[in-house]
Amino acid sequence: MDVVLQYADKYVFDTFYGKIAESFDSSSSFANTAVNSTTLGLAEKVNFAITSGLLDRNNVWRQFTSLFLITWIMGTLSYFLSASFAYYVYFDREEARRHPKFLKNQEHLELMVALKNLPGMAILTAPWFLAEIRGYGYVYDKLDEYGYFYLFFSIALFLLFSDFLIYWIHRALHHRWLYAPLHKLHHKWIVPTPYSSHAFHYLDGYSQSLPYHMFPFFFPLNKYVYLLLFGSVNYWTVLIHDGKYFSNNAVVNGAAHHAAHHMYFNYNYGQFFTLFDRLCSSYRQPDQELFDAELRNEKLQEQRIRFMETVQYTVEGKDDRTYASKKDN
Protein backbone atom coordinates (compact mmCIF):
# COMPACT_ATOMS: atom_id res chain seq x y z
CA MET A 1 0.00 0.00 0.00
CA ASP A 2 3.00 2.33 0.36
CA VAL A 3 3.27 2.56 -3.45
CA VAL A 4 -0.37 3.59 -3.76
CA LEU A 5 0.05 6.15 -0.98
CA GLN A 6 3.19 7.62 -2.59
CA TYR A 7 1.39 8.23 -5.89
CA ALA A 8 -1.71 9.50 -4.09
CA ASP A 9 0.43 11.93 -2.10
CA LYS A 10 2.21 13.17 -5.21
CA TYR A 11 -0.83 13.66 -7.41
CA VAL A 12 -3.67 14.27 -4.95
CA PHE A 13 -2.97 14.59 -1.25
CA ASP A 14 -0.09 17.07 -1.24
CA THR A 15 -2.38 19.53 -2.99
CA PHE A 16 -5.35 18.45 -0.87
CA TYR A 17 -3.54 19.09 2.40
CA GLY A 18 -2.06 22.25 0.92
CA LYS A 19 -5.58 23.51 0.36
CA ILE A 20 -6.32 22.77 4.00
CA ALA A 21 -3.31 24.84 4.99
CA GLU A 22 -4.47 27.60 2.69
CA SER A 23 -7.84 27.71 4.44
CA PHE A 24 -6.21 28.89 7.66
CA ASP A 25 -6.02 32.67 7.90
CA SER A 26 -3.44 34.76 9.69
CA SER A 27 -5.11 34.18 13.06
CA SER A 28 -4.74 30.38 12.79
CA SER A 29 -2.03 28.29 14.36
CA PHE A 30 -0.29 28.13 11.03
CA ALA A 31 0.25 31.88 11.09
CA ASN A 32 1.89 31.65 14.49
CA THR A 33 4.83 29.74 13.04
CA ALA A 34 7.98 31.31 11.65
CA VAL A 35 6.43 31.13 8.18
CA ASN A 36 3.41 33.30 7.44
CA SER A 37 1.40 30.94 5.24
CA THR A 38 -1.04 33.65 4.15
CA THR A 39 1.67 35.41 2.16
CA LEU A 40 2.63 32.34 0.14
CA GLY A 41 1.36 31.11 -3.20
CA LEU A 42 -0.32 27.72 -3.54
CA ALA A 43 2.91 25.89 -4.45
CA GLU A 44 4.65 27.31 -1.39
CA LYS A 45 1.64 26.50 0.77
CA VAL A 46 1.69 22.92 -0.46
CA ASN A 47 5.36 22.72 0.48
CA PHE A 48 4.64 24.39 3.82
CA ALA A 49 1.83 21.93 4.54
CA ILE A 50 3.84 18.81 3.77
CA THR A 51 6.87 19.98 5.74
CA SER A 52 4.94 21.17 8.81
CA GLY A 53 4.49 18.69 11.61
CA LEU A 54 0.73 18.30 11.28
CA LEU A 55 0.53 17.73 7.53
CA ASP A 56 3.89 16.10 6.91
CA ARG A 57 3.69 13.01 4.71
CA ASN A 58 5.03 10.90 7.55
CA ASN A 59 2.55 12.18 10.11
CA VAL A 60 0.53 9.23 11.37
CA TRP A 61 -2.80 11.07 11.32
CA ARG A 62 -2.30 12.29 7.78
CA GLN A 63 -1.36 8.77 6.70
CA PHE A 64 -4.39 7.28 8.44
CA THR A 65 -6.73 9.83 6.87
CA SER A 66 -5.22 9.30 3.43
CA LEU A 67 -5.40 5.52 3.69
CA PHE A 68 -9.02 5.71 4.82
CA LEU A 69 -9.91 7.89 1.84
CA ILE A 70 -8.00 5.65 -0.58
CA THR A 71 -9.64 2.50 0.79
CA TRP A 72 -13.11 4.03 0.79
CA ILE A 73 -12.97 5.71 -2.62
CA MET A 74 -11.09 2.97 -4.46
CA GLY A 75 -13.15 0.27 -2.76
CA THR A 76 -16.38 1.97 -3.78
CA LEU A 77 -15.21 2.49 -7.37
CA SER A 78 -13.96 -1.09 -7.61
CA TYR A 79 -17.24 -2.45 -6.26
CA PHE A 80 -19.45 -0.29 -8.44
CA LEU A 81 -17.50 -0.82 -11.67
CA SER A 82 -16.94 -4.57 -11.31
CA ALA A 83 -20.49 -5.26 -10.11
CA SER A 84 -21.95 -3.07 -12.86
CA PHE A 85 -19.82 -4.81 -15.50
CA ALA A 86 -21.06 -8.22 -14.36
CA TYR A 87 -24.65 -7.02 -14.00
CA TYR A 88 -24.96 -5.38 -17.41
CA VAL A 89 -22.69 -7.61 -19.49
CA TYR A 90 -23.55 -11.18 -18.54
CA PHE A 91 -25.79 -11.42 -15.46
CA ASP A 92 -29.18 -12.87 -16.44
CA ARG A 93 -31.39 -10.17 -14.96
CA GLU A 94 -34.64 -11.50 -16.36
CA GLU A 95 -34.11 -15.00 -15.03
CA ALA A 96 -33.18 -13.67 -11.59
CA ARG A 97 -36.27 -11.45 -11.46
CA ARG A 98 -38.52 -14.37 -12.34
CA HIS A 99 -37.39 -16.26 -9.25
CA PRO A 100 -40.08 -16.22 -6.52
CA LYS A 101 -37.48 -15.22 -3.92
CA PHE A 102 -36.16 -12.18 -5.77
CA LEU A 103 -36.88 -9.04 -3.74
CA LYS A 104 -38.78 -5.97 -4.78
CA ASN A 105 -36.30 -3.29 -5.92
CA GLN A 106 -33.51 -5.68 -4.93
CA GLU A 107 -30.67 -4.17 -6.96
CA HIS A 108 -31.36 -0.71 -5.55
CA LEU A 109 -31.50 -2.08 -2.01
CA GLU A 110 -28.21 -3.96 -2.48
CA LEU A 111 -26.48 -0.89 -3.84
CA MET A 112 -27.71 1.33 -1.00
CA VAL A 113 -26.63 -1.17 1.67
CA ALA A 114 -23.16 -1.43 0.13
CA LEU A 115 -22.65 2.32 -0.24
CA LYS A 116 -23.82 2.89 3.34
CA ASN A 117 -21.43 0.32 4.83
CA LEU A 118 -18.29 0.71 2.70
CA PRO A 119 -17.06 3.77 4.69
CA GLY A 120 -17.26 1.77 7.93
CA MET A 121 -15.30 -1.08 6.40
CA ALA A 122 -12.72 1.38 5.10
CA ILE A 123 -12.11 3.12 8.43
CA LEU A 124 -11.63 -0.24 10.17
CA THR A 125 -9.30 -1.47 7.42
CA ALA A 126 -7.09 1.65 7.33
CA PRO A 127 -5.15 0.77 10.55
CA TRP A 128 -3.92 -2.46 8.92
CA PHE A 129 -2.57 -0.54 5.93
CA LEU A 130 -1.12 2.06 8.30
CA ALA A 131 0.76 -0.59 10.26
CA GLU A 132 2.04 -2.09 7.02
CA ILE A 133 3.44 1.17 5.59
CA ARG A 134 5.04 2.05 8.94
CA GLY A 135 7.18 -1.07 8.83
CA TYR A 136 5.23 -3.62 10.81
CA GLY A 137 4.67 -7.04 9.34
CA TYR A 138 6.62 -8.80 6.61
CA VAL A 139 5.78 -6.93 3.41
CA TYR A 140 8.86 -6.77 1.17
CA ASP A 141 9.80 -4.78 -1.95
CA LYS A 142 11.82 -6.84 -4.44
CA LEU A 143 10.11 -9.71 -6.25
CA ASP A 144 13.12 -12.01 -5.86
CA GLU A 145 13.91 -11.08 -2.25
CA TYR A 146 12.74 -14.48 -1.01
CA GLY A 147 13.15 -16.24 -4.35
CA TYR A 148 10.59 -16.81 -7.07
CA PHE A 149 9.53 -20.19 -5.70
CA TYR A 150 8.42 -18.53 -2.46
CA LEU A 151 6.80 -15.69 -4.43
CA PHE A 152 4.37 -18.14 -6.05
CA PHE A 153 4.12 -20.30 -2.95
CA SER A 154 3.07 -17.24 -0.93
CA ILE A 155 0.07 -16.78 -3.24
CA ALA A 156 -1.12 -20.34 -2.61
CA LEU A 157 -0.42 -19.94 1.10
CA PHE A 158 -2.36 -16.67 1.17
CA LEU A 159 -5.39 -18.33 -0.42
CA LEU A 160 -5.34 -21.32 1.94
CA PHE A 161 -4.68 -19.17 5.02
CA SER A 162 -7.50 -16.79 4.08
CA ASP A 163 -9.92 -19.53 3.15
CA PHE A 164 -9.36 -21.38 6.42
CA LEU A 165 -9.94 -18.32 8.59
CA ILE A 166 -12.81 -16.96 6.51
CA TYR A 167 -14.50 -20.34 6.75
CA TRP A 168 -14.55 -20.15 10.55
CA ILE A 169 -15.36 -16.44 10.68
CA HIS A 170 -18.22 -16.94 8.24
CA ARG A 171 -19.47 -19.97 10.14
CA ALA A 172 -19.30 -18.02 13.41
CA LEU A 173 -21.41 -15.28 11.82
CA HIS A 174 -24.14 -17.88 11.43
CA HIS A 175 -24.26 -18.40 15.20
CA ARG A 176 -27.53 -17.10 16.61
CA TRP A 177 -25.70 -14.46 18.67
CA LEU A 178 -24.07 -12.94 15.57
CA TYR A 179 -26.39 -13.80 12.72
CA ALA A 180 -29.28 -11.44 13.48
CA PRO A 181 -27.25 -8.30 14.34
CA LEU A 182 -24.54 -8.75 11.69
CA HIS A 183 -24.91 -11.38 8.99
CA LYS A 184 -28.65 -11.49 8.38
CA LEU A 185 -28.45 -8.33 6.29
CA HIS A 186 -26.32 -10.09 3.67
CA HIS A 187 -28.68 -13.08 3.65
CA LYS A 188 -31.54 -10.78 2.78
CA TRP A 189 -30.53 -11.54 -0.81
CA ILE A 190 -31.66 -15.14 -1.32
CA VAL A 191 -31.15 -14.79 -5.06
CA PRO A 192 -27.97 -12.69 -5.21
CA THR A 193 -26.93 -10.27 -7.94
CA PRO A 194 -23.44 -8.81 -8.49
CA TYR A 195 -24.49 -5.81 -6.39
CA SER A 196 -25.10 -8.06 -3.38
CA SER A 197 -21.37 -8.92 -3.28
CA HIS A 198 -20.53 -6.05 -0.90
CA ALA A 199 -24.03 -5.46 0.48
CA PHE A 200 -23.54 -6.39 4.11
CA HIS A 201 -23.11 -4.87 7.56
CA TYR A 202 -19.74 -3.15 7.79
CA LEU A 203 -18.66 -5.31 10.75
CA ASP A 204 -19.62 -8.42 8.77
CA GLY A 205 -17.62 -7.32 5.74
CA TYR A 206 -14.66 -6.23 7.83
CA SER A 207 -14.53 -9.43 9.86
CA GLN A 208 -14.48 -11.57 6.72
CA SER A 209 -11.69 -9.44 5.23
CA LEU A 210 -9.47 -9.72 8.32
CA PRO A 211 -7.48 -12.76 7.08
CA TYR A 212 -6.32 -10.82 4.01
CA HIS A 213 -4.76 -8.16 6.21
CA MET A 214 -3.48 -10.54 8.87
CA PHE A 215 -1.48 -12.67 6.44
CA PRO A 216 1.50 -10.30 5.89
CA PHE A 217 1.89 -9.98 9.65
CA PHE A 218 2.56 -13.71 9.85
CA PHE A 219 4.25 -14.49 6.51
CA PRO A 220 6.44 -12.52 4.08
CA LEU A 221 4.47 -11.15 1.14
CA ASN A 222 5.64 -9.00 -1.74
CA LYS A 223 3.91 -5.63 -1.72
CA TYR A 224 2.94 -5.81 -5.40
CA VAL A 225 1.55 -9.32 -4.95
CA TYR A 226 -0.32 -8.02 -1.90
CA LEU A 227 -2.01 -5.32 -3.98
CA LEU A 228 -2.79 -7.81 -6.75
CA LEU A 229 -4.30 -10.27 -4.29
CA PHE A 230 -6.30 -7.60 -2.49
CA GLY A 231 -7.81 -6.43 -5.76
CA SER A 232 -8.43 -9.99 -6.92
CA VAL A 233 -10.25 -11.12 -3.79
CA ASN A 234 -12.56 -8.13 -4.05
CA TYR A 235 -13.38 -9.05 -7.64
CA TRP A 236 -13.78 -12.69 -6.62
CA THR A 237 -16.45 -11.56 -4.18
CA VAL A 238 -18.37 -10.15 -7.14
CA LEU A 239 -17.82 -13.31 -9.19
CA ILE A 240 -19.36 -15.64 -6.61
CA HIS A 241 -22.49 -13.48 -6.58
CA ASP A 242 -22.82 -12.99 -10.34
CA GLY A 243 -25.09 -15.95 -11.13
CA LYS A 244 -22.81 -17.18 -13.91
CA TYR A 245 -22.35 -20.86 -13.24
CA PHE A 246 -19.37 -21.59 -15.47
CA SER A 247 -18.36 -24.89 -13.91
CA ASN A 248 -19.36 -27.44 -11.34
CA ASN A 249 -15.84 -27.70 -9.99
CA ALA A 250 -15.43 -29.96 -6.97
CA VAL A 251 -12.53 -27.93 -5.55
CA VAL A 252 -13.29 -24.28 -6.29
CA ASN A 253 -16.09 -22.58 -4.37
CA GLY A 254 -17.67 -20.81 -7.32
CA ALA A 255 -20.89 -18.91 -7.93
CA ALA A 256 -23.03 -22.07 -7.87
CA HIS A 257 -21.65 -23.15 -4.49
CA HIS A 258 -22.21 -19.69 -3.05
CA ALA A 259 -25.71 -19.57 -4.54
CA ALA A 260 -26.43 -22.70 -2.49
CA HIS A 261 -25.19 -20.84 0.59
CA HIS A 262 -27.59 -17.95 -0.01
CA MET A 263 -30.46 -20.31 -0.78
CA TYR A 264 -29.95 -22.86 1.99
CA PHE A 265 -28.05 -20.77 4.60
CA ASN A 266 -26.08 -23.44 6.49
CA TYR A 267 -23.76 -24.76 3.79
CA ASN A 268 -20.68 -23.75 1.79
CA TYR A 269 -19.06 -21.20 4.09
CA GLY A 270 -15.75 -21.22 2.20
CA GLN A 271 -14.59 -18.28 0.11
CA PHE A 272 -12.29 -19.84 -2.48
CA PHE A 273 -12.35 -23.61 -2.03
CA THR A 274 -14.66 -26.38 -0.88
CA LEU A 275 -11.92 -28.04 1.22
CA PHE A 276 -12.92 -26.83 4.67
CA ASP A 277 -16.63 -27.32 4.01
CA ARG A 278 -15.87 -30.93 3.10
CA LEU A 279 -13.64 -31.45 6.14
CA CYS A 280 -16.18 -29.89 8.50
CA SER A 281 -19.34 -31.47 7.04
CA SER A 282 -20.91 -28.25 5.76
CA TYR A 283 -20.49 -28.91 2.03
CA ARG A 284 -23.56 -28.96 -0.20
CA GLN A 285 -23.33 -29.81 -3.87
CA PRO A 286 -24.92 -27.11 -6.05
CA ASP A 287 -28.31 -27.86 -7.55
CA GLN A 288 -27.64 -29.46 -10.92
CA GLU A 289 -30.31 -27.45 -12.73
CA LEU A 290 -28.04 -24.44 -12.32
CA PHE A 291 -25.78 -26.03 -14.93
CA ASP A 292 -28.38 -27.73 -17.11
CA ALA A 293 -31.41 -25.70 -18.19
CA GLU A 294 -33.21 -28.86 -19.34
CA LEU A 295 -33.49 -29.99 -15.72
CA ARG A 296 -35.33 -26.86 -14.65
CA ASN A 297 -39.06 -27.01 -14.07
CA GLU A 298 -41.60 -25.35 -11.83
CA LYS A 299 -42.21 -28.45 -9.72
CA LEU A 300 -38.51 -28.82 -8.89
CA GLN A 301 -38.23 -25.12 -8.09
CA GLU A 302 -41.18 -25.33 -5.71
CA GLN A 303 -39.57 -28.32 -4.01
CA ARG A 304 -36.31 -26.40 -3.56
CA ILE A 305 -38.15 -23.37 -2.20
CA ARG A 306 -40.12 -25.42 0.34
CA PHE A 307 -36.88 -26.84 1.69
CA MET A 308 -35.29 -23.37 1.71
CA GLU A 309 -38.23 -21.91 3.62
CA THR A 310 -37.92 -24.63 6.25
CA VAL A 311 -34.25 -23.83 6.77
CA GLN A 312 -34.89 -20.09 6.63
CA TYR A 313 -37.55 -20.30 9.35
CA THR A 314 -35.20 -22.32 11.56
CA VAL A 315 -32.42 -19.76 11.11
CA GLU A 316 -34.38 -16.49 11.06
CA GLY A 317 -37.93 -17.09 12.20
CA LYS A 318 -40.68 -15.19 10.40
CA ASP A 319 -39.66 -13.95 6.96
CA ASP A 320 -39.76 -10.13 6.80
CA ARG A 321 -38.64 -9.78 3.17
CA THR A 322 -40.78 -8.13 0.48
CA TYR A 323 -40.61 -10.11 -2.73
CA ALA A 324 -41.09 -8.86 -6.26
CA SER A 325 -43.40 -11.76 -7.10
CA LYS A 326 -47.00 -10.81 -6.31
CA LYS A 327 -47.89 -14.22 -4.99
CA ASP A 328 -45.19 -13.90 -2.30
CA ASN A 329 -46.16 -10.42 -1.10
Swiss-Prot record:
Phenotype reported upon loss of the gene: Abolishes the production of ergosterol when erg31 is also deleted. The double disruptant also leads to susceptibility to cycloheximide and to staurosporine, but does not affect tolerance to nystatin and to amphotericin B.
Alphabetized Pfam families for the sequence: FA_hydroxylase
Protein's membrane topology: Multi-pass membrane protein
Cofactor: Fe cation
GO cellular component: endoplasmic reticulum; endoplasmic reticulum membrane; Golgi apparatus; Golgi membrane; membrane
EC number: 1.14.19.20
Main location class: endoplasmic reticulum
Description of its domains: The histidine box domains may contain the active site and/or be involved in metal ion binding.
Family: Belongs to the sterol desaturase family.
Protein name: Delta(7)-sterol 5(6)-desaturase erg32
Annotated organism of origin: Schizosaccharomyces pombe (strain 972 / ATCC 24843)
